[in-house]
Amino acid sequence: MRKYNPRKIKNKVNIPIVLHKANSTIPFVQGTVDYKNVALLRKYISAEGKILSRRLTRLTSKQQRHISTAIKTARIAGLLPFINQ
């Protein structure tokens, strides 16, 4: 049996953990999701311009699909950027 050697254990790297947004339960009405409603869509986009995941937004899968298609349509229409600079 091997002996415990503390030198072989590498130092752990501190990786920042992204937590859920506080008060992210925004009243989500199905009829308000539209590609022209840029103020609502910006809440579901990260600072880099990426669509946030369901874990962060706490949406159902159906709501997430509606949001993602609206964001993609708004990007094609030129209302939202593909990449934030």
From Swiss-Prot:
Keywords annotated in UniProt: Chloroplast, Plastid, Ribonucleoprotein, Ribosomal protein, RNA-binding, rRNA-binding
Keyword field contains Plastid: yes
Entry-linked Pfam families: Ribosomal_S18
GO molecular function: small ribosomal subunit rRNA binding; structural constituent of ribosome
GO CC annotation terms, alphabetical: chloroplast; mitochondrial small ribosomal subunit
Gene3D superfamilies membership: Ribosomal protein S18
Intracellular or extracellular location(s): Plastid, Chloroplast
Any one biological process term the GO annotation gives: translation
NCBIfam families linked to this entry: S18
Subunit and partners: Part of the 30S ribosomal subunit.
Family designation: Belongs to the bacterial ribosomal protein bS18 family.
Name of this protein: Small ribosomal subunit protein bS18c
Organism, as annotated: Tupiella akineta
